[in-house]
Amino acid sequence: MDRYVLRPNDPHLWAMYKKAVASFWTVEEVDLSTDVRHWTDKLTEAERRFMSHILAFFAMADGIVGDNLVCNFAKELDHIPEARAFYGFQVAIENIHAEMYTQLIITLVAKENQAALFSAAEDMPCVKAKAQWAAQWLNATHKPIATRLLAFAAVEGVMFSGSFAAIFWLKKRSLMPGLAFSNELISRDEGLHCDFACMLFRQMANKPCQDDAHQIISDAVDIETAFFREALKTPLLGMNSDSMKLYIQFVADRLLDALGYAKMYNVSNPFDFMDNISIEGKTNFFERRVSEYQRMGVFTPSSMEFTMNEEF
């Protein structure tokens, strides 16, 4: 019965949970009124097509991540109090992300086109490939937990990264402020989720060998690259499938390094507008207050004591 008592053992994992709580936000705090006009009057048809692909993927992606947490990780790791707390909160945050993407589609996309985006996981091949890869790991409960933790770090750390960058590209051009703001909040959340996965992974036994880890990351990179070849059939000013491929490889190397493996691609970041934004949380992106959404008092000193005696 002791596992029902929330008594943290690892101050670093617990700090991740407290950071997540401090970053809570809601869909109602995002103003999309200007975005409606920008979507119609300022984005080109090619840009709307590109963003529609991204929204179609995101509309279902958080549901798969949430299912994995509820069905697998939260149960398998419930002996670790920090993981139990973090994953419980992450499920709520993934629901907010899913709600946000639904609201974006309903608000921005013409009504006759919305159904196609909501069913993209079945009907849009490049989105379906991403969904199937993530679902494959959702159902791979015969695989070691460390291997699946790595795979879902790839989902959130690689398969989300290009789409986040695409929306930051709009922000650089002062377009779609509501979408850009929600993207800042969501990418911050997902970066924290990925950081937590990496921290937990490094403490686990029975990690996959480097060849297996490289294969998982390589598969994620290939599927993500194929997605952008389809989404970016028409090159855009400052955004094309070749530069996106380099960015995805760059992010994959950062993730491999955070997980404790050798890099695979050794490429530079092709997007100057992403230089100060690390999806893996390597900069102070999570330390600063993002538009004053960090809840006051969450990081105040606590009387709770920590011990470093947990076995992983």
Swiss-Prot record:
An example molecular function term from Gene Ontology annotations: ribonucleoside-diphosphate reductase activity, thioredoxin disulfide as acceptor
List of residues binding Fe cation 1: D62, E94, H97
One Gene Ontology biological process: deoxyribonucleotide biosynthetic process
Record bears the keyword Chloroplast: no
Keywords carried by this UniProt record: Deoxyribonucleotide synthesis, Iron, Metal-binding, Oxidoreductase
InterPro entries: Ferritin-like_SF (IPR009078), RNR-like (IPR012348), RNR_small (IPR033909), RNR_small_AS (IPR030475), RNR_small_fam (IPR000358)
Keyword Iron applies: yes
Residues binding Fe cation 2: E94, E156, E190, H193
Catalytic activity as recorded in UniProt: a 2'-deoxyribonucleoside 5'-diphosphate + [thioredoxin]-disulfide + H2O = a ribonucleoside 5'-diphosphate + [thioredoxin]-dithiol
Pfam families: Ribonuc_red_sm
Active site per UniProt: Y101
CC cofactor note: Binds 2 iron ions per subunit.
Domain of life the protein comes from: Viruses
EC assignment: 1.17.4.1
Cofactor: Fe cation
Oligomer and partners: Heterodimer of a large and a small chain.
Protein name: Ribonucleoside-diphosphate reductase small chain
Annotated source species: Red sea bream iridovirus
Gene: RR-2
